[in-house]
Amino acid sequence: MAYQSLRLEYLQIPPVSRAYTTACVLTTAAVQLELITPFQLYFNPELIFKHFQIWRLITNFLFFGPVGFNFLFNMIFLYRYCRMLEEGSFRGRTADFVFMFLFGGFLMTLFGLFVSLVFLGQAFTIMLVYVWSRRNPYVRMNFFGLLNFQAPFLPWVLMGFSLLLGNSIIVDLLGIAVGHIYFFLEDVFPNQPGGIRILKTPSILKAIFDTPDEDPNYNPLPEERPGGFAWGEGQRLGG
């Protein structure tokens, strides 16, 4: 019975969020079980382009370090904000969501050549958080019961938290930068006088991922409750 409930809950996660989160968990599990090592996964331009280890372009986004607080923290944020984006502003637009993944991954890989980062998964998570926060500007957040703020400040609060933990903020800044580029090109520039939509999802992605029918049993994660693990519950201003 418990297995069936977990299975149904798992299958209710939208496809892109389910696939990416599962890939991250399985990759970490494989490293933890010593089936593979991080040295086989990290981003290394020389190994990619000279030795054709193309898989590193993907695997460096899937490993978040050994199982521990940092891994759990990243997985919770990745799952929650990836799912809320897919069920919110990308509802019924799976191809556009996949294209955002590809565009963000491409920019991070390009910038990664200059900032010497070997794993980009955390930056990718911050990008998702940034896009969600800009598209939900009136949602109020609570940071461990200590700090109240509106959603657009969330990426910066997370960066400050990383700084307090003694981590490098380069990863957070990269995620914020890529998230802002996507948000500007997709949401801001097209609505300016004379603006055009530069980011157009290729028709092949639409043919593969977009389906005309919507599942009547779909149970979305409420976008107005972004608090989640250890954050308290978010609430809209005026609500």
UniProtKB/Swiss-Prot annotation:
GO terms for biological process: endoplasmic reticulum unfolded protein response; ERAD pathway; negative regulation of retrograde protein transport, ER to cytosol; positive regulation of cell growth; positive regulation of cell population proliferation; retrograde protein transport, ER to cytosol; suckling behavior. The keyword Hydrolase does not apply. Residues 229-239 have a biased composition (Gly residues). GO terms for cellular component: early endosome; endoplasmic reticulum; endoplasmic reticulum membrane; late endosome; membrane. InterPro entries: DER1, Rhomboid-like_sf. One of its GO terms (molecular function) is protein-containing complex binding. Functional component of endoplasmic reticulum-associated degradation (ERAD) for misfolded lumenal glycoproteins, but not that of misfolded nonglycoproteins. May act by forming a channel that allows the retrotranslocation of misfolded glycoproteins into the cytosol where they are ubiquitinated and degraded by the proteasome. May mediate the interaction between VCP and misfolded glycoproteins. (Microbial infection) In contrast to DERL1, it is not involved in the degradation of MHC class I heavy chains following infection by cytomegaloviruses. This is Derlin-2. It comes from Homo sapiens (Human). The gene is DERL2.
